[in-house]
Swiss-Prot record:
<keyword id="KW-0288">FMN</keyword>
<dbReference type="GO" id="GO:0016491">
    <property type="term" value="F:oxidoreductase activity"/>
</dbReference>
<comment type="similarity">
    <text>Belongs to the nitroreductase family. HadB/RutE subfamily.</text>
</comment>
<dbReference type="InterPro" id="IPR050461">
    <property type="entry name" value="Nitroreductase_HadB/RutE"/>
</dbReference>
<dbReference type="InterPro" id="IPR023936">
    <property type="entry name" value="RutE-like"/>
</dbReference>
<keyword id="KW-0285">Flavoprotein</keyword>
<dbReference type="InterPro" id="IPR029479">
    <property type="entry name" value="Nitroreductase"/>
</dbReference>
<dbReference type="InterPro" id="IPR000415">
    <property type="entry name" value="Nitroreductase-like"/>
</dbReference>
<protein>
    <recommendedName>
        <fullName>Putative NADH dehydrogenase/NAD(P)H nitroreductase Caul_0018</fullName>
        <ecNumber>1.-.-.-</ecNumber>
    </recommendedName>
</protein>
<keyword id="KW-0520">NAD</keyword>
<dbReference type="Pfam" id="PF00881">
    <property type="entry name" value="Nitroreductase"/>
</dbReference>
<keyword id="KW-0521">NADP</keyword>
<keyword id="KW-0560">Oxidoreductase</keyword>
C-alpha cells in the first residue's frame, strides 16, 4: 500500500475542519450512495458492520431532527443540506451468516446483551469515523455532533426497530461562518507511548 500524498492527507486530516456553516449547494443522491459504498468497506470486528445511516435531507425531516438537538445544533441541522444519523443495529448478529460466512454460528458470539451492545456501539463508532473520512475524500465537509436527545431520535427515526442513535453529523459544502480557530491537539508524548 502506498503512502497518500500531502494534498490527500491535508484534505482528510490536517486542513479539514469541523464546519458549523453551510452553503445551499445540495448533495445529489448519487454522492450519498457513493459515500456509503466507501464506508461499507471499512473494517469492523468479524465484519459486523452494525452502523445504520439515515440521511436527513427533506425540510420536514430536518425540522424533526433539529427539534431534538441541543443548543446551537438545531440551526446547523436546518442549514446543512444533509445531516446523517449514525445509528447501531442491535440485531446485527442476524446478518453474520451473510457477512461472516467463514465462521458459521458467529451470531452466537453476541448472545449476551452486554456484548451485543458493546460490539454494536464500538463498531458503529468505527464506521462513523470512516464516514467522516469518506465524506472528506469525496470533497464534502463534515460537522459531527453529539448534542441531541438520543431517546427522542430513536423514537422519531428508528421506531419499530432495534436501532439506537450513536451520533449525528451534518455534511455538505462548508462556509467560513462560525468557523473557530483550530484548537490544539495533544502531542504524541501526551497521548501515546511505545512499550
Amino acid at each position: 500500500m502506498a503512502k497518500l500524498d500531502t494534498a490527500a492527507l491535508n484534505q482528510l486530516f490536517t486542513q479539514a475542519r469541523t464546519r458549523n456553516g453551510w452553503s445551499d449547494q445540495p448533495i445529489p443522491e448519487a454522492v450519498l450512495r457513493e459515500l456509503y459504498d466507501l464506508v461499507k468497506f471499512g473494517p469492523t470486528a468479524a465484519n459486523t458492520t452494525p452502523a445504520r445511516f439515515v440521511f436527513v435531507q427533506s425540510p420536514e425531516a430536518k425540522a424533526r431532527l433539529a427539534a431534538l438537538s441541543s443548543g446551537s445544533n438545531g440551526p446547523k441541522i436546518l442549514q446543512a443540506p444533509v445531516t446523517v444519523i449514525v445509528g447501531y443495529d442491535l440485531d446485527f448478529p442476524e446478518t453474520l451468516d451473510k457477512l461472516f460466512p467463514n465462521a458459521p454460528g458467529a451470531k452466537n458470539w453476541f448472545g449476551d446483551p452486554v456484548a451485543k451492545e458493546v460490539g454494536a456501539l464500538r463498531n458503529s463508532s468505527l464506521q462513523g469515523g470512516y464516514f467522516i473520512l469518506a465524506a472528506r475524500a469525496l470533497g464534502l465537509d463534515v460537522g459531527p455532533m453529539s448534542g441531541f436527545d438520543n431517546a427522542g431520535v430513536d423514537k422519531e427515526f428508528f421506531a419499530g426497530t432495534n436501532i439506537k442513535s450513536n451520533f449525528i453529523a451534518s455534511i455538505g459544502y462548508g462556509t467560513e461562518e462560525g468557523l473557530f480557530p483550530r484548537n490544539p491537539r495533544l502531542d504524541f508524548e501526551e497521548a501515546a507511548r511505545i512499550i
